[in-house]
């Protein structure tokens, strides 16, 4: 009986150790998750600006601290985003529906990122990656074409 209990205990210890090792090896501590609420707000505001003929101010939708935005064309490889940022891009997006917008702090670190989930597209910006200052992140939407507002 004692041998059986020792064998069961050893098997359980190995199982728990194996699970802990699997979790440790597959963890992704540095991944930056997409801000779903911000993505939905931006997508809704694009549709509203198109319908109402109003401007879309990204700074008003994202009122927290950030200084620049990168507008990333769909299908842009992570390696290209990493080159532009100057460090590895670890953004996690379950599925890509449109352009990614990466909000950067003054030091170049990522504040947050969102993805545009509507039927429109960005126009009048550099591809595959455009950079705009916060003050320039005001857009006109016409026929679901999102373009920076002329200053």
Q: Model-derived features: where do they sit?
A:
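C-terminal partner/receptor-binding element of secreted or periplasmic proteins
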Residues: 120-151
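N-terminal export/targeting and maturation segments
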Residues: 2-80
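Functionally constrained cores in energy, signaling, and assembly domains
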Residues: 28-29, 105, 123
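Generic alpha-helical propensity signal that fires on short helical segments
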Residues: 19, 84-89, 122, 128
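Mature extracytoplasmic domains of secretory-pathway proteins
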Residues: 52-119
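A residue-level detector for conformationally permissive "hinge/kink" positions
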Residues: 9-12, 100, 135
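Compositionally biased, low-complexity repeat tracts
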Residues: 13-14, 82, 116, 139
């Amino acid at each position: 009986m004692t041998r059986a209990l020792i064998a069961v205990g050893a098997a359980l210890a190995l199982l728990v150790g194996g699970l802990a090792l699997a979790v440790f090896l597959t963890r992704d501590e540095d991944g930056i998750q997409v801000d779903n609420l911000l993505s939905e707000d931006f997508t809704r505001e694009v549709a509203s600006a198109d319908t109402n003929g109003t401007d879309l101010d990204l700074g008003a939708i994202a009122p927290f601290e950030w200084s620049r935005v990168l507008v990333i064309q769909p299908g842009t490889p992570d390696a290209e985003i990493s080159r532009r940022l100057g460090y590895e891009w670890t953004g996690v997006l379950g599925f890509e529906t449109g352009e990614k917008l990466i909000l950067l702090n003054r030091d170049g670190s990522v504040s947050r990122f969102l993805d545009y989930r509507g039927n429109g597209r960005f126009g009048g910006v550099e591809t595959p990656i455009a950079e705009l200052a916060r003050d320039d992140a005001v857009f006109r939407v016409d026929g679901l074409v999102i373009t920076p507002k002329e200053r």
